[in-house]
Swiss-Prot record:
Gene Ontology MF: a single term: toxin activity
Lineage top rank: taxon: Eukaryota
Organism: Phytolacca dioica (Bella sombra tree)
SUPFAM superfamilies reported for this sequence: Ribosome inactivating proteins (RIP) (SSF56371)
Active-site positions on this chain: 72, 122, 175, 178
Identification of the protein by name: Ribosome-inactivating protein PD-L1/PD-L2
Length: 261
């Protein structure tokens, strides 16, 4: 498995853009695309996982593990007392859990477990972060960098600290790879913190639906109008692929053929 690294503690807009490009290239199925938008592989691809190593201020690191076919974050690891410490969401079970353990920390003799005692749903992460909505958790490179330091190598931290880090990391890594719109919001606000707007939250919740609509489009026309949201929360009706294409980074896997260009 290839590890994609990103140093949030020492970065530029271009370096973040390169990180996004590398992540999309590692994740996508090279033989699949609809209307020029790359698509993720189905779940039987040979390489099933991706590792993303994030570095924060003062060289602290956290490695996220993503499921390649949908970019879900399954858990993360950090160096702790000379060992590799792994943290896995509690909705990852059975053989998959063992796979995550072994992928995050390959040496069974020098690893520690600190399980995430909740699941990876946004509603759960919001509850643990003690917010009503993730729109209340600010995103930004500085926040990502300092959040890494609050967890990496620390003997203890609260669920609140961890859930806030996960909300930031999931959106700035996985969601930004899925949606160029989110990547562009990070770039536009690069030297400041920002709250995710209504369009960000709405895209995040509708990625599967949007992917299917694009896949099923005929000559660029969606099978039916897609009702989404603008940044200010007003209704955004999408009728054609080219209206939403600039916002897309990767499509979720959809079975069957589509128009490739």
């Amino acid at each position: 498995i290839n590890t994609i690294t990103y140093d949030a503690g020492n970065t530029t807009i271009n370096k973040y853009a390169t990180f996004m490009e590398s992540l999309r290239n590692e994740a996508k199925d090279p033989s699949l695309q609809c209307y020029g938008i790359p698509m993720l592989p189905n779940n039987s691809s040979t390489i099933k996982y991706l590792l993303v190593k994030l570095q924060g201020a003062s060289q602290k690191t956290i490695t996220l593990m993503l499921r390649r076919n949908n970019l879900y974050v399954m858990g993360y690891s950090d160096p702790f007392n000379g060992n590799c410490r792994y943290h896995i969401f509690n909705d990852i079970t059975g053989t998959e859990r063992t796979n995550v353990e072994n992928t995050l920390c390959s040496s069974s003799s020098s690893r520690d477990a600190k399980p995430i005692n909740y699941n990876s749903l946004y509603s759960t992460l919001e509850k643990k972060a003690e917010v009503n909505s993730r729109s209340q958790v600010q995103l930004g490179i500085q926040i990502l960098s300092s959040d890494i330091g609050k967890i990496s190598g620390q003997s203890s931290f609260t669920d609140k600290t961890e859930a806030k880090f996960l909300l930031v990391a999931i959106q700035m890594v996985s969601e930004a790879a899925r949606f160029k719109y989110i990547e562009n919001q990070v770039k536009t606000n690069f030297n400041r913190d920002f709250s995710p707007n209504d369009k960000i939250l709405d895209l995040e919740e509708n990625w599967g639906k949007i992917s299917t609509a694009i896949h099923d489009a005929t000559n660029g026309a969606l099978p039916k109008p897609l009702e989404l949201k603008n940044a200010d929360g007003t209704k955004w009706i999408v009728l054609r692929v080219d209206e939403i294409k600039p916002d897309m980074g990767l499509l979720n896997y959809v079975n069957g053929t589509c128009q490739t260009t």
